Amino acid sequence: MHYVTSKRNSLLALAVFSALSLTSSVYAADYVMPDMTVSGVREGQSTEVDSTSVVKPLGGIADQEQSAGLLGAKDALDTPFTSMTTTRQSLDYFGTPAKGPTDMLSLNPSVRDSSSSLYNDISIRGFKINGHGMYLNGIPGMLDQQHAADVYIDKATVISGPNIGIVGTPNRESAAGTVEFTSKRAQVKPNTDITLAYLGGSSMKEVVDIGRRFHNNRYGIRIMADNIHGNTAIKGENIKGHDFFVNIDQKTANSKTNLLVGYNYINQHASPYTFGFDNSLTTLPSAPDANRTYKTSYSYNQFDNWIVTLNHEQKLNNHMTAFFNGGYHREDWFGYIDGSPKIINANGDYTIKMTNYTLGITSKYAGVGIKGKFKTGSLKHDYVVNVDRHWYEGFGGNVPTWGNNGSIIATGNIYTHALDGSQYYLHNRVEGGSPWSSTQIVNGWHVSDTVSTKNDKWQLLVGLHGHRTTISKKDGSKNSYNGINPTYAIIYKVNPNISVYASHSESFMSGQTVGSAYANRGEVLDPNKTKQNEVGVKIKNGKLLHTLSLFEIKQANYNVDSNNYYRRYGEQKDRGVEYTVAGSVSPKLDIIGGFTYLDAKQALNGKQVNGTAKWSSTMALVYKPNTKLSIIGRAQYMGKATIINEKFNVPSHITFDLGANYDTKISGTPVTFNAMLHNVFGKNYWLPMASSNNLLLGQPRTFVMSATMHL
């Protein structure tokens, strides 16, 4: 389903109209959080603080309180794995027009960018993940894999490595880790924020964000909408889209509820994605100009998404709480004519085989459970029991009446910018629904207990997750399998500011869905087992949190065969070291970043996993010389990687971003100005993707700026 232009324009009008009728102020509660005391802070900053602990936000761009899935919100020192929570402010500061949420996630050194303006993909510790494998308000399967909406995002938490034992049952393998977004709620201070943003090229974005609370702060409503349009900083690329989200929450002494309803629509023309390389090539061509597209003007991706999430908690007594989490997501990729350039010689000539390929998914989730506390002698127990079901239907297939299933070939050259797509005009474009391809039903259960000694000096986490999955495919086949996934961990608190931990986790779920760049696109790969071991230490120094960890992950390896089918190929073993730091060095300086060393090997041949660099690092700084001005900077480094089983070396690269944020008043109205120059030196570079022989072209130098009125 998609809106016509008049309906798209009405979204912002509806949000503005709603602002005129909203009054009162606030109490916000998270769907898995304990009772909270909230202080009024300018929108975009972290505002929720646990009244029962000393947990405070780590400056403005990170938070020491982190969502740990079904375990609820926890102090970072009490989580036995590498994790990081970034706030809305980090997205406002560092988000690019092309990638949005990806830039928020990639502040975490565990995360490596694998995205373009068309897909918001990442990898964590050498394993890929897209929106379908992420969580929204604790619910799996609610996000799309394409250019993602971000107007509703308040926080993002990344837990590195497979952690199915502490989250709701997904429908697919999540070896990379757990990524969870939390939606904005109405805050203590009512907000009416109107933003006008320039996104590079001739593209613009208008945003409305309104929050109010009612009935002695019991009920809250947050309305968020945006409109995006224009030619981007990449010459030849055009984007049109809009998002509209409403978040409603309530809280009493015995219950709390959160409902998020959203819709987003995008129409992108000539948006860049991957480059492939012909087998005849003996050297990797240098990266071409990133300021232009290498696709034909008629290539496009048009899709929309409906998203609904519901979370409810009901206090049964002083020691027990029942909870429900439910969600619905419909993704309709009804317009698709596209293909990826394949470079065929050292001169930079390339071809594109175009396909007319529509896709769709319907994902539904429901989970109920009980959580609570009890004691056995001097030991404290914090337990969770949960059962859930995940329904997933996939739709997709080439439209056989167009292009003879990919025979249309566009030709061009990455250096001379020659491009011929004239064969397209011999064929008619077809849009519409997609044929059914598969149905997957996953029934899951979860039991965990965190046992703590006096003063939480020692903590032991023991958890089991089980599920039964049934997959029905269009070829008539029907397969079922069962999986039991243990999670266990131990934490020792040296003192209140230092913790040492060790953990083991396993995951056994359906394989990933093959992407559109491969001949078996849309196929759900067979299930496989993932195991991770991790040891680490966390140190809190004032408002600065340090984490140092060593990890090992084993999982099935994937590769591309000579017919461009993405298949399982032996085992992948990743070993590495991570260091993360987040928080405030001083009242005037915030810092977030770290580094990862990753030794990812293919067990069958001992070679480096395709598209996986050994070294990567990210570091972002926010300097606040006074209360009005913030100077923002970020550096991102990616070390050398290899592709096609070490045939080509992908050069290392480093990029820099620089910007500023300024708060002032105009005629008595508070206004926030933001300006950012991404890729300051305009570097052209290849960006590798984990377990892939294709490469992305890095984003060009892009200047963005915005003005937000706080009415």
What are these regions, as identified by a protein language model?
Residues 191-193, 198-273, 298-317:
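Transmembrane beta-barrel wall of Gram-negative outer-membrane proteins
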Residues 313-315, 321-327, 331-339, 526-598, ...:
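Membrane-embedded beta-barrel scaffold of Gram-negative outer-membrane proteins
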Residues 591, 640, 662-711:
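C-terminal beta-signal and adjacent terminal beta-strands/loops
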Residues 150-193:
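A beta-strand signature from Gram-negative outer-membrane beta-barrel systems
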Residues 455-457, 552-554, 568-645, 681-684, ...:
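Gram-negative outer-membrane beta-barrel transporters
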Residues 41-43, 48-121, 135-149, 160-166:
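Periplasmic N-terminal accessory/gating domains of Gram-negative outer-membrane beta-barrel systems
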Residues 361, 380-392, 434-555, 584-586, ...:
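Structural signature of Gram-negative outer-membrane beta-barrels, strongest in the C-terminal barrel
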Residues 267-281, 391-396, 491-534, 539, ...:
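Surface-exposed extracellular loop regions of Gram-negative outer-membrane beta-barrel proteins
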